Amino acid sequence: VWSPDSREILFLRWSDSELSRIHRVAARGGKARALDHPKGQYTELAIDRSGETLAVRKLAGSALLNPEWSVQPGLYLVERKSGDMQFVSARGEHPHFGPDGRLYAQERAESASGRGSSTASTVLISMSRSGHDVQQVASAELATRIQLAPDGQHIAFINGHQVHLAATAPSAGETLILDATKPAFPTLRLSRVGGEYLAWNADGSAVSWSTGAEFKTVPVADAMRPGFSPPQNGTNLSMRVAAARPDTRLALTNARVITLNAQRDVIDSGTVLLEGNRIRAVGDSSLAIPDGFHQVDLEGKTVVPGFVDIHAHGPYGRADIIPQQNWDLLAHLALGVTTVHNPSSQASLVFAAAEYARAGRILGPRIFSTAEIIYGAKSTYYAPVETLDDALAHVRRLKAQGAVTVKNYNQPRRDQRQMVIEASRREGVMPVAEGGALYHMDMNLIGDGITGVEHNVPTLRLYDDVLQYWCQSEAGYTPTLVVTFGGLTSEDYYYQDTEVWKHPLLANFVPPA
């Protein structure tokens, strides 16, 4: 965050050993200095109008992040100069300050998880700096973010992945109902294809967000003028970083080599030459080994191509914290998985982890993902599709964030699913889908041009008509045998017939439940 006088930038930096640290650096550049505050997992940094007090949310421990220093999670105030911390409340997330000096935050009003719930609403609450006198300020059904402007005159919120601006000020004792489709007061859509990381400038005169690497800002005065059109472009904040590439030359010798050539040959005493990040040659023991290659004798071992887990669900991080060491990624890698694809994830986490892995900052397989699903059910994931432009907006948003595939997930009508497929075709990304345990939906998706079907078709047998139809479409099939429709899962099989907990690689990398 920027200090209100624009002279300083404050930010959070994570390390697995030190956890979250608040740093401050001069806006003109220079060496960043860490505040002296208690250790913890902190996220969602904010600053008040005076510039003297910060707010953060402290997380409890989790299966992915360090479980230590997790006592009393919730909202905290931090003195900018001293680093002294004061607990405020266990309620709320995304803290920010209003014009009255009170602390504002959002929380879920319903207990639903957000998958398929028509009552998944979010409320904006305010409280004193001691955590007392909690008041409900605004409510928005299916919203993921609600943030009051620092001057208190407008509210920005994200609904259906789009950024909206409501021209209204809260009143004591009254809950404002924010509704982008049937507003009770002037409400404008600010984003063209959607966005994340909602923020206000210091005086509340402009609201900003990002769509992938593009940072976009709209002055409130411009938005309120007749004929306003959401901005097409923004400021590109991307930077070029060298991809990790080893400079080693290795010759793996005397190994049993499983190949992927046209004949699927198995070479009993084979040699594999590795140069940098490429396989230079594969052959039998007669393959010449050039000078400069370090030989590794793998007698009695088998070398196989890296496995691709095409349906692998994280985790990659939590609340924008990406750990430097992720047991899930390490376990995949140890078991020979060199590429994973996640068909339902969170863009801010999965693509951050993917870029870190590609740059060599974290160790793990190559990571690809659809990020958030294009979801047809009413939830905080809800992605409404009524027109082709709606579908294009969702696909472009995900593509801008890093997606090479999108998840066409349970849009209820066939024409809606067709729009997502057409939008994907136009944008050059691959649509995958889940038929929701419905045989006829799977068949419709294949006929409409889906790239791949996730999860098994829920029938005991598929006959030749379906096999011919499916094969000619060239649509992929990922049955995800550990999660199945209409039958037992293979996960249960392994629990029944093997002692899973004794597997040496699982025992080494996967923590106990």
Where are these regions (language model features)?
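Surface-exposed loop and turn segments in beta-propeller and other repeat-based domains
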Residues: 172-189, 230-235
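Conserved blade-ending motifs and adjacent loop-strand segments that build the rim/top face
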Residues: 138-143, 181-199
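Metal-associated gating/positioning segment near the N- to mid-region
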Residues: 301-359, 379-380, 386-389, 415, ...
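Divalent metal-coordination and catalytic microenvironments
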Residues: 255, 272, 277, 300, ...
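A flexible loop/linker signature enriched in serine peptidases of the S9 family
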Residues: 1-4, 10-23, 27, 36-43, ...
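Histidine-rich, glycine-flanked metal-binding segment
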Residues: 263-304
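Active-site neighborhoods of metal-dependent hydrolases
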Residues: 393-412, 458-513
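Divalent metal-dependent hydrolysis catalytic cores, especially in the metallo-beta-lactamase
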Residues: 328-348, 365-373, 399-411, 421, ...
